[in-house]
């Protein structure tokens, strides 16, 4: 964040809260600190993923989001295993479970969002959430191909990310843009399913 301030770049920080690092109190302190520091820096609430957070911890994030009326961001439905384990734990997919906690009442976004149902798409659309696709990471980790064409058809905004160096060999946004369209066409079995402007 300090480097962004030095260069005049806009920066959005997102907490990666989980059962093993930081605490809701620390996240709240960072949220208040960075959102007052400079108009170029914003800090959004977030947590790593449903499977790395206890239900109690997720409730605290949701309560914070309601208190500050702010969006929440997290890794969501990245792998089939994640989805199946969430269904075994709570009887719902990750988006449905998080929605039941009121997590996205003020919007937000999901990173990856590879394995989703029609009901999950309804959650994203209803809360005006963003999907942040990470095709290089999903390819490296064999997580699957995100249904980008479905998101576009349902008017769910899609952003492109890299995930991070631990799960992506190359943090090149131009490569990610190519992968988004190329993998989507492969999934749809239609070379015209995504045009250049999309």
What are these regions (language model features)?
Residues 2-117:
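Metal-coordinating catalytic core of metallo-dependent amide/deamination hydrolases
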Residues 16-19, 78, 135-139, 164-166:
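Short, acidic/turn-prone active-site loops that include or flank metal/cofactor-
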Residues 47-50, 113, 140, 162, ...:
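Glycine- and other small-residue-rich loops at beta-strand/loop junctions that grip anionic moieties
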Residues 100-107, 149-198:
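His/Asp/Glu-enriched, well-ordered alpha-helical/loop segment
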Residues 110, 115-118, 139-145, 170:
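C-terminal active-site-proximal or functional interface alpha/beta core segments in diverse enzymes
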Residues 110-113, 132-134, 159-162:
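Active-site neighborhood of phospho(di)ester-bond hydrolases with catalytic His/Asp-centered motifs
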Residues 120-128, 134-140:
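Long hydrophobic segments that form regular secondary structure
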């Amino acid at each position: 964040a300090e480097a962004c301030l030095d260069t005049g770049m806009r920066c959005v920080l997102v907490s990666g809260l989980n059962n093993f690092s930081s605490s809701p109190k620390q996240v709240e302190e960072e949220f208040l600190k960075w959102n007052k520091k400079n108009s170029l820096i914003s800090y959004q609430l977030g947590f790593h993923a449903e499977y790395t957070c206890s239900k109690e911890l997720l409730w605290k994030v949701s309560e914070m989001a309601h208190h500050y009326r702010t969006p929440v961001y997290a890794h969501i439905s990245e792998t089939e295993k994640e989805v199946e384990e969430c269904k075994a734990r709570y009887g719902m997919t990750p988006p449905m479970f998080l929605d039941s906690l009121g997590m996205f009442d003020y919007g937000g976004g999901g990173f990856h969002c590879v394995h989703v149902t029609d009901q999950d798409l309804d959650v994203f659309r209803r809360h005006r959430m963003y999907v942040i696709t990470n095709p290089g990471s999903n390819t490296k980790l064999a997580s699957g191909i995100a249904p980008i064409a479905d998101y576009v058809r349902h008017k769910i905004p899609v952003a492109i990310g890299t995930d991070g160096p631990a799960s992506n060999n190359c943090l090149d946004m131009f490569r990610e843009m190519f992968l988004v369209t190329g993998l989507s066409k492969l999934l749809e079995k239609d070379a015209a399913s995504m045009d250049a402007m999309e």
